Amino acid sequence: MKRNLFLSAILPFSLAVALCACGSTPGESTPSEKTQSSVSQAQTDSAATGNEISIGNNFSIEAGTVLSDGSIYFVGREGADGFCAYVSTDDGDSWTKEELPWADQTVVGIKLRPDGFMLGMRGQQVVYAARGEDLKTADISALGAIDGISAVYPIDGDTFTVTGGRTETFVNEDGQEQETIHPLPFEDMVLQYDGSLVTQWGEGIAADQAGYYASDEEKLYYVDFETNECRSLDGAGQIDSYGVLATIKGSSFCRNGIFYYVDDQGIVAYDTTNNSESRILTDTLAPFLQDDVSCVTLIVTDHQAIAVAADLNSETQTVYRYEI
């Protein structure tokens, strides 16, 4: 498929969660009073070691966010029980399970907004659910006749963007039949949930050259692969460009206009309000940066950075928590 869908679908893995403390000496605890309105100079280089804990019973994370009240919110599958959520109000020290009305549904490409709103795909449907509510189907009739949807991303509280087109079957180099979706007849549309078409923003170009999408509930931020610039898309289809980023190795996350991403040295915070960049974690030996491991989910709170790492060989997940 043409689009980089790094975050569109996460394969289920068993989960172990590692809590890692960094940026302080053993025995020290340095409270933070930072907010995410700007990148603080106190977010300095750091290294990490720590222990592992478990969340739930065979819980596999599909998506995560920081809720408006600062709580950590993960949605995923728990064994044969289907989808559920786990919430932490104490930066990951303890977790509370939250049942989801759509637990038994087949939903892929899950994305979360800071209010707990979920957007995803079910077959050729775009589905969504407010926190604690059942699934609803978005009206995508404005797209006309379609054969396939490859990705959906929330922009703000009223709009989302969707990519897809015609499905074609071909034989790959191993002699196996494989399907791909061409960027026709639509590509990168901004839609309202009632089916109104706002604009077509990608025009078949951004699909080749953009990825690492993350919404802060006001705009959808992403990386332009051609220039490696951070850009944003609003609900009216307006695109803004910011500065050039380092090479992204893992997942991304956005909160209050700050675009966080994983590179080959750790975690970087790019503040789009003033085009400044600060490294909040430096640790080239971090487990989520190693070969055969991929950082599939990244979230950043006022005090913690949490990276969900997937081991591509053993099909396990480990979550690493760092003080920042």
Residue spans for each PLM region:
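Beta-propeller fold detector
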Residues: 51-53, 96-101, 136-144, 180-182, ...
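Repeated scaffold domains used in trafficking and secretory/extracellular systems
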Residues: 58-66, 104-113, 145-155, 201-215, ...
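Short coil/turn segments that connect the beta-strands within blades of beta-propeller domains
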Residues: 69-70, 115-116, 157-158, 217-218, ...
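Short glycine/acidic-enriched loop and turn motifs that connect beta-strands
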Residues: 77-81, 125-126, 166-170, 266, ...
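Conserved Ser/Thr-centered positions that define the repeating blades of beta-propeller domains
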Residues: 88-89, 129-132, 232
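Blade-level signature of beta-propeller repeat domains, shared across WD40, Kelch, NHL, RCC1
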Residues: 297-324
